[in-house]
Structures are given as C-alpha cells and as structure tokens.
C-alpha cells in the first residue's frame, strides 16, 4: 500500500524552500528605496573609478579549466558516499566505481592531448 503521509516532511520542506526566496524578492522589491542616477549606472570597481572598459570577454581557457574542475568535483560528490560504505557494498560496486573513474581519466587524457589544459 502506498502511503502518502510518509512524504509530509518532504512536501513541507519543498514548499518552504520555494516560498522563502520568492518572499525575499517580493519584500526587498517593496521595501527597497527607488533611486536612479549616474551613480547607480556607473561601474563599481573596488571603490575607485574603473580603468578602461569594464566589460571584458573571458578567454575560453578559463571556461575549459572550470569545466574540468566541475567534472572532477562531481566525481568527488559521487565517490565520497561510496568510500564511506566501501566495506558494506562489496566487489561489484568497487568495479562500477573503478569503471567510473576510468572513464573520467580517459576524458582527462583526451582533454590534455587536445590542449585544453594549456595556456599557450
């Protein structure tokens, strides 16, 4: 029998986590003073006048490093629970984790050989 009352805490948390940001935006929009002027339109750069154009295009190298970082950060998120319950899970899960890491290493070697990790 499927009992929906077991999920009451989940639904309450979901509704609260949706309502809190919405209410924060609405309240700040109502209470914030409306002031427009040249100070609001100027670029802020550490309290001093900006030197040159404030809008600079990032190099694609930063994007590639960020992408590789995110991939290996997600790998850590997946492997940490596995490492904490390694003795309970057995050999089959070890093989699955090994294949997962192997695929990521192959991707890293591919990115390295393509020159995605070099600054030149």
UniProtKB/Swiss-Prot annotation:
One of its GO terms (cellular component) is chloroplast thylakoid membrane. It catalyses: a plastoquinone + NADH + (n+1) H(+)(in) = a plastoquinol + NAD(+) + n H(+)(out); a plastoquinone + NADPH + (n+1) H(+)(in) = a plastoquinol + NADP(+) + n H(+)(out). The chain crosses the membrane at residues 9-29, 64-84, 88-108. The keyword Transmembrane applies. Pfam families: Oxidored_q4. It is found in: Plastid, Chloroplast thylakoid membrane. One of its GO terms (molecular function) is NADH dehydrogenase (ubiquinone) activity. Its EC number is 7.1.1.-. The keyword Transmembrane helix applies. InterPro entries: NAD(P)H_OxRDtase_bac/plastid, NADH_UbQ/plastoQ_OxRdtase_su3, NDAH_ubi_oxred_su3_sf. It is a multi-pass membrane protein. Keywords: Chloroplast, Membrane, NAD, NADP, Plastid, Plastoquinone, Quinone, Thylakoid, Translocase, Transmembrane, Transmembrane helix, Transport. GO terms for biological process: photosynthesis, light reaction. It is an enzyme of class 7 (translocase). NDH shuttles electrons from NAD(P)H:plastoquinone, via FMN and iron-sulfur (Fe-S) centers, to quinones in the photosynthetic chain and possibly in a chloroplast respiratory chain. The immediate electron acceptor for the enzyme in this species is believed to be plastoquinone. Couples the redox reaction to proton translocation, and thus conserves the redox energy in a proton gradient. Belongs to the complex I subunit 3 family. NDH is composed of at least 16 different subunits, 5 of which are encoded in the nucleus. This is NAD(P)H-quinone oxidoreductase subunit 3, chloroplastic. It comes from Nicotiana sylvestris.
């Amino acid at each position: 029998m499927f009992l929906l009352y077991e999920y009451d805490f989940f639904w309450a948390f979901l509704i609260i986590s949706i309502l809190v940001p919405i209410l924060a935006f609405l309240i700040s929009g109502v209470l914030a003073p409306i002031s427009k002027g040249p100070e609001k339109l100027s670029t802020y750069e550490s309290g001093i006048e900006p030197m040159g154009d404030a809008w600079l295009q990032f190099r694609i190298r930063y994007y590639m490093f960020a992408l590789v970082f995110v991939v290996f950060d997600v790998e850590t998120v997946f492997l940490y629970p596995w490492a904490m319950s390694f003795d309970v899970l057995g050999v089959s899960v070890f093989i699955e984790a090994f294949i997962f890491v192997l695929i990521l290493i192959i991707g890293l070697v591919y990115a390295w050989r393509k020159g995605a990790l070099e600054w030149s």
